[in-house]
Amino acid sequence: GKKDMEEVVAAAKNNQGMYGKKTILFIDEIHRFNKGQQDYLLPFVEDGTIILIGATTENPYFEVNGALLSRSSVFELCPLSQEEVETLILRAVQDEKKGMGSYHAVIEEDALHFLADLAGGDARSALNAVELGILTTPRSEDGMIHITLEVASKCIQKRVVRYDKTGDN
């Protein structure tokens, strides 16, 4: 809310005044901020108190204040390729520290291709399906969890197709 934003701005001003440092403010789902909240940030973006980074799944030209947009650079992050999603899946299955490697799972090649293809470039969707497969599949006699095509097909979640106001996704 507004009180939170006022606290962030006060801390940013303090950083700038005491240490000569600018504050980077990252706002996820910036399209959920109403016009008043976005307007509140504008003078602090203009005077350099705040470097604003906003992320949105919506078309920023419809959902973000035009004044903020005119003082911003817009970067579009494109979906990952199937090969990139496959690499992420394999890394997650094998990595014992940051992934699910401690579960001792293996994913069959056809299951890997299937999940990466159905993810449509969305790593989160693919990784959620793999995690569900690992957590719900009993270990085989060899002590490993095998993610087969059958397991993978049971773990997929229906992909939501999103459209913006112009009908483009």
Task: Identify the meaning behind each predicted range.
Residues 22, 102-118, 149-154:
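Short conserved motifs of the RecA-like P-loop NTPase core
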Residues 73-86:
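Conserved AAA+ ATPase "SRH/arginine-finger" region at the nucleotide-binding site
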Residues 113-118, 124-139:
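C-terminal helical "lid" of AAA+/P-loop NTPase domains
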Residues 130, 136-160:
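Conserved C-terminal helix/linker of AAA+ ATPases
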Residues 160-169:
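Conserved P-loop NTPase/AAA+ ATPase motor core
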